[in-house]
């Protein structure tokens, strides 16, 4: 059996923004994340049920660095308690 290395995600950082340009604004934030230490991946999300709401869900090897968020954005860091592949 091949040795599989799975990088452990320790934290998830969510950033939420509402408004007609929310996805465009958060896309700018998303583009800065790969250069940060501990970054493991992220998605920019939207929902047809809430068309003016956009969300970044990013995964980190440890605590995410303290990063600026756009005016009006809400953000939270969660500790990953359990994960499944």
Question: In which residue ranges do the predicted regions lie?
Answer:
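Short S/T/G/P-rich N-terminal loop/turn motif that feeds into the first structured element of a domain
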Residues: 1-85
């Amino acid at each position: 059996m091949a040795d599989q290395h799975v990088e452990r995600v320790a934290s998830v950082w969510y950033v939420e923004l509402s408004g007609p340009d929310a996805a465009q604004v958060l896309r700018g934030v998303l583009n800065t994340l790969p250069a940060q230490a501990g970054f493991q991946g992220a998605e920019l999300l939207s929902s047809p049920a809430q068309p003016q709401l956009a969300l970044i869900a990013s995964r980190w090897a440890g605590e995410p660095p303290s990063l600026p968020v756009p005016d009006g954005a809400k953000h939270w860091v969660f500790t990953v308690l359990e994960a499944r592949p």
